[in-house]
UniProtKB/Swiss-Prot annotation:
This is UDP-N-acetylmuramate--L-alanine ligase. Pathway: Cell wall biogenesis; peptidoglycan biosynthesis. Gene3D superfamilies: Mur ligase, C-terminal domain, Mur-like, catalytic domain, NAD(P)-binding Rossmann-like Domain. GO terms for biological process: cell division; cell wall organization; peptidoglycan biosynthetic process; regulation of cell shape. It comes from Herminiimonas arsenicoxydans. GO terms for molecular function: ATP binding; UDP-N-acetylmuramate-L-alanine ligase activity.
Amino acid sequence: MKHKVKNIHFVGIGGSGMSGIAEVLLNLGYTISGSDLGSNAATRRLVELGAKVTLGHAAENIASADAIVTSTAVQQDNPEVVAAREKHIPIVPRAMMLAELMRLRRGIAIAGTHGKTTTTSLVASVLAEGGLDPTFVIGGLLNSAGANAKLGAGEFIVAEADESDASFLNLSPVIEVITNIDADHMETYEHDFEKLKQAFVEFTQRLPFYGVAVLCLDDATVREIMPRISKLITTYGFHEDAMVRAVDAKAVDGHMQFTVIQDGYAPMQVSLNQPGMHNVQNACAAIAIARELGVSDHATQKALTEFTGVGRRFTRYGEISFSAVNDKPAGSFALVDDYGHHPVETAATISAARGAYPGRRLVLAFQPHRYTRTRDLFEDFVKVLSTTDMLLLAEVYAAGEQPIVAADGRTLAHALRVAGKVDPVFVEHIVDMPATIMNIVRDGDVVITMGAGSISGVPAKLKQMQDQV
């Protein structure tokens, strides 16, 4: 019956997860349309590929749709959703459409609170180098492919599995990865960490009897749930009991060198073209899957050496020049942009920057994401943000939430100041962030812009300001 569905409409098509699925379906021969509130690189790419994208939401946008796909960000009173209900057009949540794609291939699903996008990208890159030509759907731009999705001719599909709304429980993969489990998106789990842990256990139960759960043994919560998992397990990480174990890891000229040891295999020397110990862990997950699927170590080594990363995951913009102002001489600073918005991710990126740029002053421009996350992880943010040398703190990016008393940027800045390890500069309006950075930066600094909200536009503004120097 699926042949009767020809026209698929995406409500919120510009989102990272939505646009990737839309691109794969477009390449499968479906007619794709979609709507979003604004244009971005993803919508422009889809238009170039043949999709019809409309700015703004209206009932007439779904006039020819046989089905519509929605993300969790789309409200039930959206005019396109309302019109679809009235016309009895099937409304498919994004995760369910991803599950349908996974039925067409053998699925490899990457789950975990942190590291999903990079790990998914590493797995896709290694399998591609190994000749398996996978389909992939990633929550960020895979730089080497210039896209966040690709329809491959091979039998595997590699995709992120989203725990934020528990939608990963819709997937039926043959291989799963769990990178780590931390408290985030706790409203989905009634603020009960035990329920979050149980959801990951149930995720592994989606595997067939011959499926494999690839688990990071470095994570204490992953170790805690392992006795509840009744599937084949491969472990990875730095832990001495990990089956795929990284040893002798060190940062060299902005990338990581390490050795992988595993019973039945010769030690493998790896040069990973990404900084940070957390990326060594992510690479070990890719190595475990590559070996499970018969990819040669030589192909794996080549893919990891040539891996160019993912958009907004420690993206390096090179050196940015600035002019002399008053008593400050002209100079330049290294600019890095990152999507991290959880204290664990922030700590990992700061650590990676210390390794990639030893001895240089670290300036962090951070935009908290969501009032609920800022409230729930307030003390963790104070602890982590205090480890930078200079902090520019933006107001919280609401992401549709209403403000919460004492969970705003100004309160967080005050708490950091009281803690006494860093004296933050509070930047109330994100449009002022580029100029603020240019005013305080010194020659030789490393500037990291970080967050999941509108701070993503700051690097481009800094580059524009450099061009005017």
